[in-house]
UniProtKB/Swiss-Prot annotation:
Belongs to the complex I LYR family. MZM1 subfamily. GO terms for molecular function: protein folding chaperone. Assembly factor required for Rieske Fe-S protein RIP1 incorporation into the cytochrome b-c1 (CIII) complex. Functions as a chaperone, binding to this subunit within the mitochondrial matrix and stabilizing it prior to its translocation and insertion into the late CIII dimeric intermediate within the mitochondrial inner membrane. Modulates the mitochondrial matrix zinc pool. It comes from the Eukaryota. InterPro entries: Complex1_LYR_LYRM7, MZM1/LYRM7. One of its GO terms (cellular component) is mitochondrial matrix. This is Mitochondrial zinc maintenance protein 1, mitochondrial. GO terms for biological process: mitochondrial respiratory chain complex III assembly. PANTHER family: COMPLEX III ASSEMBLY FACTOR LYRM7 (PTHR46749:SF1). The lineage of its organism: Eukaryota, Fungi, Dikarya, Ascomycota, Pezizomycotina. The keyword Transit peptide applies. Interacts with RIP1.
Length: 123
């Protein structure tokens, strides 16, 4: 029964991966093409269901999530000379799915007292 659901899950994971590449690499055709070719190659190598099929599907889903939420591309918009050095300016393509962290955890971490001479887990 599980083998019958794996092809549907694999197709779904493949489609999610293709959508994630389109979001992450929109406007950069060579990289988009290379990412999609690699995804196809990996799925073609795993065409026959096996013991590790669920792990490979999970890997594809996690890869799609990382591509969608953590990849930001930059394009060079100008090069200027400032102070005798070449300075490049880039525009970042941040989209609606890009994960934006907040600094609340970093700010809160600085408020804890530091224990000197004790391990991290000792009282």
């Amino acid at each position: 029964m599980a083998a019958a659901t794996n092809p549907v899950s694999a197709i779904s994971a493949y489609r999610q991966l293709l959508r994630a590449t389109r979001i992450a690499f929109n406007g950069d055709f060579p990289v988009l093409h290379a990412a999609r070719a690699e995804a196809r190659k990996q799925f073609d190598q795993s065409r026959q269901p096996g013991v590790d099929t669920p792990m490979k599907i999970q890997h594809a889903l996690e890869t799609a999530h990382i591509l969608r939420s953590n990849i930001v591309q930059g394009t060079k918009i100008e090069t200027k000379e400032e102070g005798g050095e070449q300075v490049d300016r880039y525009a970042l393509r941040i989209h609606e799915y890009t994960e934006r962290g907040d600094n609340d955890t970093i700010k809160a971490a600085g408020q804890k007292p530091v224990k000197v001479g004790k391990g991290c887990c000792s009282s």
